[in-house]
């Protein structure tokens, strides 16, 4: 089904956070994450003025840290870039094609079935791992149920937890 394929794309997209999933990309992200004055949850809240947050991640883009939140509003998708020092919206770009559009479509499909918001899922994951910092939260479907794949940085270790959204 289209929804099943969308869910697979969404979960596969989670692995794209580290570009080529190389150690260098992970090391850069771990190092740069310390420079952020806000957490992922604050970025999610800041993006809400641009629609329903459907995924969020810190990433390294051209050697610089970036906080990106995908939102859905009135059937359209947007990438909201958040200033990781102030928590203010820097830029809003429509997502209309390509891999980003496919990812946003699958994430939106998963969130449409969710009873829990993305921020609530992140808060719950953090509460179960007190010292960890959230790197990303990307929803998808697992066995027909909406689940958020949440990447946590605990010390120098990255780990992924699956947080049910229903």
Task: Please annotate each region the language model reported.
Residues 1-166:
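Long, terminal "pre-/pro-" and other extracytoplasmic accessory regions
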